[in-house]
Amino acid sequence: MFDKATAEDFARDWLAAWNDRDIERILSHYSDEIIFHSPRIAKVMGKDIKSVFGKKALRDYWTKALALAPQLFFELDDILVGSDAMTILYTNHREELVAETFIFDPDGRVARSVAAYR
C-alpha cells in the first residue's frame, strides 16, 4: 500500500531534485524500464513522439529539456495518492499547472509516468 507520508517524501525529494537541476537524483526515482508520456517530448526532441522508453532515453530527453529551461522551478500545489500510484500537482516556472502521475513498480521506482499541462 502506498501511503500519504511515502507520497509526500517522494514528492518533496522529486521536486527538490528538479529545482536543483540534478539529473542523476531525478533519474534515481525511475526504473530502468520507465515509460514516460508528455506532450512536451516532441517539442524538446524535435520529433513527432509523445513517449520515451527506458532510463537512457529519459536522460537524453531531460538533459535537453533542462538546457532549454534555465529558469526551471517547480512549486508543489498538492499530492494525490492511489494504491500503487500518485499524482503531483505543481506549478512550473511558466506559471502552468502540471499534473504528473507516477505508477510504481514493486521496488518503489517509477515504472510509468504521465505529465499533463493546463
Give residue ranges: language-model regions:
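Short, low-complexity N-terminal intrinsically disordered segments enriched in polar/charged residues
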Residues: M1-S28, D32
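A solvent-exposed, acidic/Ser-Thr-rich amphipathic alpha-helical stretch
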Residues: K4, R25, S31-D77, G82
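A beta-strand edge to alpha-helix "cap/lid" segment located at domain peripheries
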Residues: T63-R118
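Hydrophobic pocket/interface hotspot
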Residues: W14, I26, I34, L58, ...
